[in-house]
Structures are given as structure tokens and as C-alpha cells.
Amino acid sequence: PKPFLLHGVTASGKTEVYMRVIEAVLARGESAIVLVPEISLTPQMTRSFCQRFGRNVAVLHSKLSSGERFDEWRRAERGDAKIVVGARSAVFAPVRNLGFIVVDEEHENSYKQEESPRYHARDVACERARISNAVCVLGSATPSVESYHRALRGEYNLLELPHRVEMWEMPTVEVVDMREELAEGNRSMFSRALSQAISDSLDRGEQVILFLNRRGYSTFVLCRECGYSMRCPECDVALTYHAAGSSIRCHYCDHEEPVPLVCPSCGSRYIRYFGAGTQKIEGEVKRVFPRARTVRMDTDTTRRKGAHETIVGKFKKGEYDILVGTQMVAKGLDFPNVTLVGVISADTCLNLPDYKAGERTFQLLTQVAGRAGRGEKGGHVVVQTYSPEHYAIELGETYDYKGFFDEEISCRNEGMYPPFSRLILVVVSGKNLRVVEKYSTALVRTLQAKVRSVKEWKSIRILGPAPCALARVRGMHRWQILLKVDPCITPHDHNKLIEEMLEACPPPSYDIIIQVDIDPESML
């Protein structure tokens, strides 16, 4: 059977749909796999499934110890557990007699494994279901543009849940133009509307989620005297200030150093912190709302095993009033007493050099807004932005997915981006910048010659070579070549083109690393 795309608004009961199908699958003596995009969502999904199906549920994800993972793997393999819940690697679970696969929040880019072997769990799920003659359901409130396009073309069966359960209203959304706030003298990171809404929610004994997709305290550290920016010695990125431990840290290679007392360039003491991360938001909340019990959930606070469950559990029990977090808090979590969500900066994703920036912004706004009003009390969302006129924000304000899809698909068609092409990203990296640049240029010449020589390949567009958006990571200089390939060209031809390119133009030394990513999720 063709895969099903279940497009249901947040809190529309998609999990209940999955469970009812699984009940029917188990009654036929078959097994099921349920994929979730984040490890932080696994405990909540597991709890729901265990309450319904008891010991029939196994859990698989990377935070388990090897012994725990082995035990769960064996339970699935022996048939002791008929349902496997887990993150992307659970798609390979050795269940017996597979009848059903769910890919929940199918739009999430965390389903793509960026290390070798590269794969997208959604594609693996669809293929495994086809081979096993099983049913595959892709669920999302904000389906990926590619998946929705496939559904409209009839490659997927489209199912829709347009209303919340018990006809609860979607949260109201208020977009605040931060340019106007600044013009009227408000230099705080909280708009007046958000400050008032937080105060009102706390007075009513309700909970608040504040979302900012950037961890740390400040995004960069700068000398006001000479303009010197503290940068990672190994990567081409600014170091992020972390108040805990008073250090500056690289989020790509984990390089860490103490905050300098004077500028390393000019010796000035005018060192200042710019930008805001979740740590800074947490500190500001504690300053402005000192009586509120505040907790932060990001990569820094959830490094320890079980930290996700602890924070989520305590917040759900009402031990905290305000949850400050990154995208971890945007997905799938269910807190009935949360009536207010504040998006501190909707522009964080929007300004990334990535063709999916608009899509990611719309998805994050819709998903994080969906954490509010998941009960009888109703919900309100305050979105702070410097780009209120952008279609991703305008249409996110009204949850208009179809309107957003029409805008986005038009932009993709114009730029020949997926689904109107398949992308192949070739990244060349090495210690010596001149060698990397020279070899990247030689690769492009080789590709151009190959494309001209084969009739079926003449439609392929080659962009580059150019430095990657992150031009240096862990001491390695990085250049990229992007191929836009007609979707009609087969994966076999993709591989043939890459193989012939590397045969005709082998790397000049072992110091050069070549990474080939077909259908990259990010251009960063």
C-alpha cells in the first residue's frame, strides 16, 4: 500500500489514531514501529503506549546504555515486544511480522542521519513498509513540503484532522514588531505584550513556555574598543558565552576557554556580550519575575541521562511555572496547564543561509504554538519578530499551512529546489585552504565535462565551488559543490556520476576528505 500522510493540527489526536491502528495490527498477530524525532519525546510516547499496551512495548534510542539497548533489541527480535518506540535508528528494529510503521512529526530534520551511513528514517520507513507489505503513516501538523507535494501528486494517501480533540480552539497568536518596541523605547528582550501576558498567566496559576532556538547566554563576545570578536581557533564561528562556569564555548567542536578580562587584540577592558541565548532568557525571567519558578531545557541542561524526563515530569506536575527552552520544547510535549507560549525571536531560523529557512520557521512557530491551550483553558501565543511581513510569520499567525505551502512551493519551483530537483551536496575539506580550493575547482571542471557527455545528465545544474556557510570546522577548511538534479534521474545514475567524477579526479592526498550527501536536510 501507498504511505499515508496524516496532516493533523496540533492536539488533534494523531497519537490516538496510531494507537487504534496498532490495536488492529496486534489483533492480526503483527508488530509495529513508532518513530519520534527527539529522544526527549521518547519517554512521553513510551508512557502513553505502555499505559495502553503494557509490556508489549520496547524502547530504542541512543541515550540507552549498550546493555539496555541490547536487552530491548532482543525483546523485539524474540517477539516479546510487538511495539518498538524510538528515535530514527529504531526504524531498523528486528520486529517479527511487521504490519505498521509510524513516523511521527515526519517533517523533522533530526530523522536524517548526518554521519555515514547517511539515511533518512522517513525514506527507510516507507521502503521497509513496502518490502514488508506493511502500512506506513507519516504524521505531522506541518508536513514537509516534499511530503505534502507527494500527497497532492497521489504518491501518498492524504488524511486530514483539521480540528483539535473535543473541538478545543487553536491558541490565539499575537505578532509583535520588535522594531516598533525599540522605537518606543523598550530595549528589553521582552515586548510589553509578552511581559503583560506572562504576568497575567502567573496570576492565574497557569504555566508559560518561552522559546528561543539558541542556547548559551550570549551569541558572541565583542571588544567595544576595536571591534575584535572572540572566535573559535578551530572553526569559523563566534564563541558563545555561557554564564555557568564563565566560559566561551564553540558549539561545533566544543572548544572552551575562560572569558578574557581584556581584549586579546588591543588590551581594552571594554568586553561586552551581544545577542541572547536560553541562559540569558532564563536569567532575565528570574530578574523580571522573581517569584516565578523557572527551569531551562536545552542541550546544556539535558546532558545527563534521564535529565529530559526529570525536567518534563517536574514541569508537568506544576513544580515550575516557566519553562525556557530551545526546539526541544517545540515538539510533541503535552502540558495541559500551559496557556501561554512566547517566541522570543522568530527570526533566528529565518536568517539562515538555507533554502528551507522559511519552512523551518513556519514549522517551529506552529509546533511551539501547539504547546499552548492543550486543555479546556485555551491558549495564547506571542511571537516577537523583526520581520512580521515575511510570509512564514504572516501565515504562521493564522496556522494557514496550505497558504504557506502555496507560497513556498512557488519559491522552490522558481529556484529549482526540492521537490522540483534532488540535491547532491559535495563537501571537500582539508587542513590546507589552497589545496581544498584547487581540488574543488578541479572537481567542478570534471563534473561539467561529465554532464556534457551524457544526454540524460545535461539538465543537471552545478553550483560552486564556494566556501561552505561554516567555512572552517575543527581546523578543517570546507568548500562545497551543489548539484541540482532532475527528479527523473535515478539514484543509480546519481551514484554513477559521483563514482565517475572521483575516478577522473581523485583527491590529491589523504589529507582531503570528500563527503557526498544526497538530499541534504541542511545547507549548513
What role is predicted for each listed range?
Residues 445, 449, 455-473, 498-499, ...:
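A carboxyl-terminal module marker
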Residues 204, 376-377, 455-459, 508-511:
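Short helix-terminating capping/connector loops at secondary-structure junctions
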Residues 454-455, 474-477, 489:
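Nucleotide-binding motor/catalytic cores of P-loop/tubulin-like NTPases across gene-expression machines
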Residues 490, 495, 512-514:
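A subset of signal/propeptide-processing and intrinsically disordered low-complexity segments
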Residues 53, 289, 450-456, 506-509:
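Short helix-capping segments at alpha-helix termini
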Residues 439-445, 493-502:
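Short amphipathic alpha-helices in soluble, non-transmembrane regions
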Residues 285, 368-372, 447-451, 501-506:
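Hydrophobic, Leu/Ile/Phe/Ala-enriched alpha-helical segments that form helix-helix packing faces
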Residues 2-437, 441, 469-471, 480-481, ...:
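Inter-lobe coupling/hinge segments of SF2-like helicase ATPases
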